[in-house]
Design a protein with these regions (language model features):
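A conserved acidic beta->alpha catalytic loop
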Residues: 44-52, 99
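Acceptor/aglycone-binding surface of glycosyltransferases and processive sugar-polymer synthases
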Residues: 57, 64-72, 76-86, 91, ...
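Short beta-strand/loop segment that forms part of the nucleotide-sugar
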Residues: 10, 23, 34-46, 68-69
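Acidic helix N-cap motif at the loop->helix transition within catalytic regions
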Residues: 17-21, 49-58
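Short helix-capping segments at alpha-helix termini
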Residues: 30-36, 59-64
Length: 133
């Protein structure tokens, strides 16, 4: 039986310091979730630091890592849209590389989709509780 795939879309702008930490955490979570396959789709949004170089290295080491690189900065929404257009997973999550939201939440969100029967799940971090959207 074919495993379902989760695509993790990660818009990136000048994330050279965050990427190694984020990748380590998301890779750890993916190994814990043996029932699923993963795709890590990073979107480099015209970064001026070593973000693109790090993404190239990660994609050579891990065939689950793919990246798109913009020649200039289009903003986070442009990166999210490009990621959504290119994701190949059965499920999609958008995460920030700075780990504002912990990658471990992927397990909870996947459980809620599969076991609770939701069509869509979202995360609201404790630091955002009380904000009016």
């Amino acid at each position: 039986m074919k495993k379902e795939k989760i695509s993790i879309i990660v818009p990136c702008y000048n994330e050279e310091e965050s990427l190694p930490i984020f990748y380590k955490e998301i890779n750890k979570i993916s190994k814990e979730m043996k029932e699923t396959d993963f795709e890590f789709l990073f979107v480099n949004d015209g970064s001026k630091d070593k973000t693109l170089s790090i993404l190239r290295d990660l994609s050579k080491k891990d065939d689950r890592v793919r990246f798109i690189s913009f020649s200039r900065n289009f903003g986070k929404e442009g990166g999210m849209y490009a990621g959504l257009e290119n994701a190949t997973g059965d499920y999609v999550a958008i995460m920030d590389a700075d780990m504002q939201d912990p990658p471990s939440m992927i397990k909870t969100m996947y459980h809620d989709i599969k076991e609770e029967g939701y069509d869509c799940v979202a995360l609201c971090s404790p630091q955002h509780v009380g904000y009016n959207f």
